[in-house]
Each structure stands twice: as C-alpha cells, then as structure tokens.
C-alpha cells in the first residue's frame, strides 16, 4: 500500500528508445523557436505539448505498453516565466538616466520585453542560458520544474529543450549583503583563523646575492648605510638619491640636478663634493653588520683620480662632480675585495636656473690576486666583431670602448660620451665653451674633446683581442690639419670635426664569416680664427663611418662532366639508316622483296 509521502514526489518522466541520450547545449543556436509550446501543468503538474496530447503513441518494442500512473503535487500558480531576467549589474548601461540602445538590461528603457523592441541585445546584457535538448519524438510527458520549449533546428527536426539554471554562465551576481543579523552565521560558515604576525629576529645573510644592496659604513659617525647610484626619474630626469646599487649589477645612470641658488649649493651640497663619494668603507659581506667596526670586514674606497673640493671663485663654481665611476672586485661568497672610484669634475657658471648633468657608472669584475694581471673587459665578439657591440680601443695596455661626443640638454658638450658601435654609422655634435688661452693650449683642449680621454692609439682587429698581445691590434692613422694650408700669421687653426673611418671585412668560411677591422683613420677638419677674435664657444662634430671591403670569392663550380653516349650505329638494325640518304635510295625495297617471295610461292603451287 502506498504511503501519502510517495504521492508528493515530483517526477520528470521521460521515455527513451534504446540508444537515445539527451544532449546538453548552452543555447539552441541555429534553431528557430516555434510557437511557445510551453504549458504549465494543471492539477497533474505536467507539461504536455498540445499536439502530443491528442495523438496516440504507438507501442515501442521492448517497453511496457502500460504507463504507470504518476502522482505529482499541484504546480505553482500560473505566472510569467522570464527566461532572460535583468542582470544585477548592467555592463552596457553607460548613460545614467537615459536608455542605451540595444542594452537589454538597462532599467532606464522601461521595457518589459526588450527583445521585441531592439534588433539585438548587446553581449552581457542578458543572462546566458543553458539548454538540454533531445529529439521531440522521444518525449512522452514532461513535468520538469524548469521552463521548456520545442525548437526547430536547421534540419527541420523538432527538439525538446529544457532551460537549466546554470549560474556559472553569468559572472555578474549580486553579492550577499552582510549585516548585524547574519554576520555570525556567515562568520561561522566562511570564517577562519586569523593570521597574527610574530616578530622574528633574522640574522643577516652570510654573503651577497645578485641584486642585493651593498652595505657601507661611515666610521666617523658609526652609521651603516647603502651604496647609492642616483638615477633619473620623471620627464626631466631629476636625480633620485634613494636608488641603491645592486650587487653584481653593472650599469650606468644619468640624471640632472637643478639649483635655485648655486652660490650657496656650491660648497654645501654633498652631491657636488667629491669627498662624499669615497669617505666611507664598504662591508665585505652582509654579516659584517653585527660587527661593522671590525677592520677585517671593511673595504676602503680607493680614489684613482685627482679630486678637489668645490670652490666658489667669483661667478664660477669650480670642481663640481660630473661623473662617478665605481670599480668593484668580488670573490664569490667571500664578498667584496676591492673598491675604487674615479671622479670627473667640471665648472659651473653661477646663474639663475643652473643645472648639472651627472653620470654614475658601476662596474663589477672578478677579483684578481696578481696585480700584474691585465684588466679584463667585455668582448665585442669571439672572435669576430658582432654588429652593435663596442669598437675596442687601446691606450697603454688599457682596453676600452671608443666614444663620440654627446651633448647635454642645452647643447653644450657633456662629460658622458656615446660608445661607437661596430657596424653602426653615427654622428654627434655639441658646443664647447672656450677659455682664454693661447693657440696651442686651445688646440690641445679641442683635440682631447674630440677623440676623448685618453687618446685612442690602437683598435682591436677582432672582438676578443687581448691587450697584452699587440699583434691583435692595429694602429690608428691620424690626419691632422695642415698648418701650411693657410696664409695667415695671426690665425689659430683649431679642429672642429673628427671623422673616424673604419675599414672592415668578413674573413673565414662562407658558412661562418667573422668580421674584423682592417684599418682605422682619424680625419680632422679645421677652421682658422683670428687671435684677436673673442671666441667663447665652438661647434664640434664627431662621426664614424664603417666601410665594408669584403671581397667575396667566386662561387665554387664543379668539373665539366663527360658526355657519355653510345655510337649512332651501335644497334645492327639501324645500320642501314646510318649510311646516309644515298645508301637508302640504292637499297632494295623490302616491299619488292616480299612481292618476289610471294610470286615464287604462287608459281610453286601452280606447277
């Protein structure tokens, strides 16, 4: 006997023949909906197609013909089911207080059925719907609590589809409101243990790692600080003092300083004083922080260039720092072993809005025990030059990159110079402010400005040239201005342009050519000025020109092949044809011979 509770079960009764399975679909795309064959069940709580209600279903083999009686509760009252309800967050509602066209979720449109008004709905303005469809012919009766429809697909087959509430397809959902009434319940469901921070004293690492800030120590004040490498920030490239130098990170930075009152900043600003860049020590390893006064862990900063204190002389601030170059030698986990610094200084004119461009260079290299060992420098190729790598120059067994002039923001010559890149033609220029001096000193100053300090004497033939091996370097040819070319005894001939001509070529195998320098020449162009002329500045130009003189060999060619062939009359059947036209005419025709043979046979038969 059935219990009353079983009568309350709501059944979704589907009859499927063998081998038929429902196919889920996110949307019945391509299917054109027919008239809405959706009917809410009456007291029976079933959804039935009108055409299927009157039709008599034939018996399906293998299935019982007697359908069990389904007892279901009454369906809820009749109400309109909105298959595309308005989203809680309308992403296309861009105009407050006005209706956005084709935005089906815009509440300002006041449309009950926006699909009937708009030609289409913008993406994200309607809920994405998920449908599960099967062939309509296999459905006998449906009392699904979800909305259902019958669609006609592109092949004309009716599909029975059930709309499933799939919240995963709709990403914009209303967040649950949290108030005093439901807070405890939500906290019990979603709450967890809070994280409490515990202060733990960590000992400094035993050695530097790449990128770690470098520690410094000021014995005079017993203060531990960091080695700074000011860098430019913003559109104007203002100097940021807080930029730390990273361990094993060789790089260069440039920044600009502006002074409201250079007369007072000349001697008070530590950034202009050379002593502020070497009056401290560097800690070998980070663990030296625990005992910074131990001289065993301190590395003094060695000054390798002449540096004078800033001095305000009249309207000029002399000996201000314009370039700082640190050379740091490291020895793996043993830390920093040696630190040296070289400074470049210049003079500034005290004027409103004065500025100074500073250049900071930081180089790391492996520590060498032997002082006689040559300084290692980066290669520009191995062995041949690589396009874009620096052109290597040599002066007094010191290898460095050849450079060109570089101008500051106001057009004056900067202490910083452009590197000459192999295979890249370049030109640069600037204005040099001249001091009152005799002609020889003026010429010497301009020559040094054009080719840089020190003056290049040799150029590396290959990119991996060793400074100790003179055979791997070629001497630079110089062509100075001819003094006899001018007919003026009271004139001074000064250089105004330097052209660096580099002849290079590819050598080696065609499959792996190597670029090498064949020769370099410095070509100066000069102009004469009167000694009586008060020239305050002169425009200088430097350019480099690479000329490819590669002579490519002839492409390889194979040996001539023998023309092997049989003689024309090799086959005996062609002997007659190989005797020429005359012999063919004199030969007996095969047809005539055949006729004679037939005539002889006939005569024999008649006898």
Swiss-Prot record:
Its main location: membrane. The chain crosses the membrane at residues 582-602. This is Tectonic-3. It is linked to Orofaciodigital syndrome 4: A form of orofaciodigital syndrome, a group of heterogeneous disorders characterized by malformations of the oral cavity, face and digits, and associated phenotypic abnormalities that lead to the delineation of various subtypes. OFD4 patients have tongue nodules, multiple frenulae, broad flat nose, hypertelorism, and short rib polydactyly with tibial dysplasia (Majewski syndrome). The presence of severe tibial aplasia differentiates OFD4 from OFD1. Joubert syndrome 18: A form of Joubert syndrome, a disorder presenting with cerebellar ataxia, oculomotor apraxia, hypotonia, neonatal breathing abnormalities and psychomotor delay. Neuroradiologically, it is characterized by cerebellar vermian hypoplasia/aplasia, thickened and reoriented superior cerebellar peduncles, and an abnormally large interpeduncular fossa, giving the appearance of a molar tooth on transaxial slices (molar tooth sign). Additional variable features include retinal dystrophy and renal disease. It comes from the Eukaryota. Changing residue 95 to P: Found in a patient with Joubert syndrome also carrying 2 mutations in MKS1 gene, a deletion in intron 15 and a missense mutation 'C-80'; uncertain significance. Residues 603-607 are cytoplasmic. Residues 1-22 form the signal peptide. Part of the tectonic-like complex which is required for tissue-specific ciliogenesis and may regulate ciliary membrane composition. May be involved in apoptosis regulation. Necessary for signal transduction through the sonic hedgehog (Shh) signaling pathway. It is a single-pass type I membrane protein. Keywords: Apoptosis, Ciliopathy, Cilium biogenesis/degradation, Disease variant, Glycoprotein, Joubert syndrome, Membrane, Signal, Transmembrane, Transmembrane helix. GO terms for biological process: apoptotic process; cilium assembly; positive regulation of apoptotic process; smoothened signaling pathway. It comes from Homo sapiens. It is found in: Membrane. Part of the tectonic-like complex (also named B9 complex). Residues 45-54 have a biased composition (Polar residues). Belongs to the tectonic family. Residues 21-60 are annotated as: Disordered. Glycans are attached at residues 78, 179, 347. GO terms for cellular component: ciliary membrane; nucleus. The gene is TCTN3.
């Amino acid at each position: 006997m059935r219990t009353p509770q079983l009568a309350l079960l709501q059944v979704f009764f589907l009859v499927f023949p063998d081998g038929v399975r429902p196919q889920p679909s996110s949307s019945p795309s391509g299917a054109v909906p027919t008239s809405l064959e959706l009917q809410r069940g009456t007291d029976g709580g079933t959804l039935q197609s009108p055409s299927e209600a009157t039709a008599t279903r034939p018996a399906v083999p293998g299935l019982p013909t007697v359908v069990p009686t389904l007892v279901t509760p009454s369906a809820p009252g009749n109400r309109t089911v909105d298959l595309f309800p308005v989203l809680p967050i309308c992403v296309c509602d861009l105009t407050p207080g006005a209706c956005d066209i084709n935005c089906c979720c815009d509440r300002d449109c006041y449309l009950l059925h926006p699909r009937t008004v708009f030609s289409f709905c913008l993406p994200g303005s309607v809920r994405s719907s998920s449908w599960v469809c099967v062939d309509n012919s296999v459905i006998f009766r449906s009392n699904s609590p979800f909305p259902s429809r019958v669609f006609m697909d592109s092949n004309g087959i009716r599909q029975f589809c059930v709309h499933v509430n799939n919240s995963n397809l709709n990403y914009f959902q209303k967040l649950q409101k949290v108030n005093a009434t439901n807070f405890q319940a939500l906290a019990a469901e979603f709450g967890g243990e809070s994280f409490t921070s515990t202060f733990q004293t960590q000992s400094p690492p035993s050695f530097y790692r790449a990128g770690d800030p470098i520690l410094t120590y000021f014995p005079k004040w017993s203060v531990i600080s960091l080695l700074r490498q000011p860098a430019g920030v913003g559109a104007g490239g203002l100097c940021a003092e807080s930029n730390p130098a990273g361990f094993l990170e060789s790089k260069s930075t440039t920044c600009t300083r502006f002074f409201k009152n250079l007369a007072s900043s000349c001697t008070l600003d530590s950034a202009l004083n050379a002593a502020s860049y070497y009056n401290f020590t560097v800690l070998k390893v980070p663990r030296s922080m625990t005992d910074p006064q131990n001289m065993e862990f301190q590395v003094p900063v060695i000054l390798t260039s002449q540096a004078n204190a800033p001095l305000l002389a009249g309207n000029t601030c002399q000996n201000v720092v314009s370039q700082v170059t640190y050379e740091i030698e490291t020895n793996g986990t043993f830390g920093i072993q040696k630190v040296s610094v070289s400074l470049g200084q210049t003079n500034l004119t005290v004027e409103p809005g004065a500025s100074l461009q500073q250049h900071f260079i930081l180089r790391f290299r492996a520590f060498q025990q032997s002082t006689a060992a040559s300084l290692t420098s980066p290669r520009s190729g191995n062995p041949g030059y690589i396009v874009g790598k620096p052109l290597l120059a040599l002066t007094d067994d010191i290898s460095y990159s050849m450079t060109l002039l570089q101008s500051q923001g106001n057009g004056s010559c900067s202490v910083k110079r452009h590197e000459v890149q192999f295979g890249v033609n370049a030109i640069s220029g600037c204005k040099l402010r001249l001091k009152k001096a005799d002609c020889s000193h003026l010429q010497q100053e301009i020559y040094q400005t054009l080719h840089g300090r020190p003056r290049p004497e040799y150029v590396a033939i290959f990119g991996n040239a060793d400074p100790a091996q003179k055979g791997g370097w070629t001497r630079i040819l110089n062509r100075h201005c001819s003094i006899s070319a001018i007919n003026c005894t009271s004139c001074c001939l000064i250089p105004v342009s330097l052209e660096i001509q580099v002849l290079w070529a590819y050598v080696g195998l065609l499959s792996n050519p190597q670029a090498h320098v064949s020769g370099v020449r410095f070509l100066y162009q000069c102009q004469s000025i009167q000694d009586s002329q008060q020239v305050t500045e002169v425009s200088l130009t430097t350019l480099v020109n690479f000329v490819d003189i590669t002579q490519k060999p002839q492409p390889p060619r194979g040996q001539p092949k023998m023309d092997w062939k049989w003689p024309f009359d090799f086959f005996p059947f062609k002997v007659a044809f190989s005797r020429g036209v005359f012999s063919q005419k004199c030969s007996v025709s095969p047809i005539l011979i055949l006729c004679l043979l037939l005539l002889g046979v006939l005569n024999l038969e008649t006898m």
